[in-house]
Amino acid sequence: MQAGFFHTPYNLPTRTARQMFDWSLKLAQVCDEAGFADFMIGEHSTLAWENIPCPEIIIGAAAPLTKNIRFAPMAHLLPYHNPASLAIQVGWLSQILEGRYFLGVAPGGHHTDAILHGFEGIGPLQEQMFEALELMEKVWARKPFMEKGKFFQAGFPGPDTMPEYDVEIADNSPWGGREALEIAVTGLTKNSSSLKWAGERNYSPISFFGGHEVMRSHYDTWAAAMQSKGFTPDTSRFRVTREIFIADTDAEARKRAKASGMAKTWEHYLFPIYKKFNLFPGIIADAGLDIDPSQIDMDFLADHVWLCGSPETVKGKIENMIERSGGCGQIIVNSHDNIDNPEPYFESLQRLAQEVLPNVKTS
């Protein structure tokens, strides 16, 4: 089983852009050296707790600092980009990384980002994402066209476009060709329509964990959509995000986790988000408890939401998740702000990739 890293980035709002840039590059190096397979970076323009508006800048800067790890924007919010420009950017960046790149796409789920880009809400964004991606695919195909859609326009020059000039067109298509470019989509709610859309197009699924039943529904929704279009689903392509903290003992891991940036993020930021998207009921059901989401505290999180403990304990928790939810190919660690005390966090990441996941029984 692979290890992945999701650099959302869940940073303290007081951090400067330079602090986040330097922290991001350090995390990429730590994950690469530890043996992580993938490093994914969020894209948000207005969220003080998730403040990386340009993931491609982090990816480009991290390219020469790392050797094996793959990078992805997770995700480029397509309605907010010019499709032709983004298609060229994605292709060129994948060439810089010589294949250590894949692409996450999304419509955008935060109203403040939508307002910044001139939308009153997020309602129309999904349709715009579909159109944007269709135009990006045409640009990558490198065949002459000119198209004005409902929301965007794009084209690709050919020999008849400017016959009076002999122009050699740059090849900024994805490294290895379009078929070599993996596209991934995240799912949040049960029976996610986003993952259905992904399955119909042979894109890879990423499940934001909201309990075992939700996780299983994410895979089943994606797999059924894959099969409906003649594709073959495989659990090795299924990724799931989790909160993880590992130390020598369960007690030490719990102590470190509750003193970490992960605890601060949950206390001040993630509690409202999980309540907004109704993610707690599935987690409460998994715990076998009859409580209201308002009763959830840090101890509940450490026991039932975070994968927190010794390497052996975390291994057991992952195996229990696999048994109850059907399996996955990659566990993705959610990123948290541990700039002020990074070493326990780095140790946890290293132990996950080197001591825990290689020993997880996947069947």
From Swiss-Prot:
GO terms for molecular function: 2,5-diketocamphane 1,2-monooxygenase. Keywords: Flavoprotein, FMN, Monooxygenase, Oxidoreductase, Plasmid. Its EC number is 1.14.14.108. Pfam families: Bac_luciferase. Pathway: Terpene metabolism; (R)-camphor degradation. InterPro entries: Bact_Lucif_Oxidored, Luciferase-like_dom, Luciferase-like_sf. It catalyses: (1R,4R)-bornane-2,5-dione + FMNH2 + O2 = (1R,4R)-5-oxo-1,2-campholide + FMN + H2O + H(+). The keyword Coiled coil does not apply. It is an enzyme of class 1 (oxidoreductase). One of its GO terms (cellular component) is cytosol. Optimum pH is 8.0. FMN binds at residues 74, 186-194. It comes from the Bacteria. The keyword Flavoprotein applies. GO terms for biological process: (+)-camphor catabolic process. Coiled coil: none annotated. Belongs to the bacterial luciferase oxidoreductase family. PANTHER family: BLL0895 PROTEIN, LUCIFERASE-LIKE MONOOXYGENASE. Involved in the degradation and assimilation of (+)-camphor, which allows P.putida strain NCIMB 10007 to grow on this enantiomer of camphor as the sole carbon source. Catalyzes the FMNH(2)-dependent lactonization of 2,5-diketocamphane via a Baeyer-Villiger oxidation to produce the unstable lactone 5-oxo-1,2-campholide with (R,R) configuration, that presumably undergoes spontaneous hydrolysis to form 2-oxo-Delta(3)-4,5,5-trimethylcyclopentenylacetate. Is also able to convert (+)-camphor and norcamphor to the corresponding lactone in vitro. Homodimer. Likely forms a loose transient complex with a P.putida flavin reductase that provides the required FMNH(2) to the enzyme. This is 2,5-diketocamphane 1,2-monooxygenase 2. It comes from Pseudomonas putida.
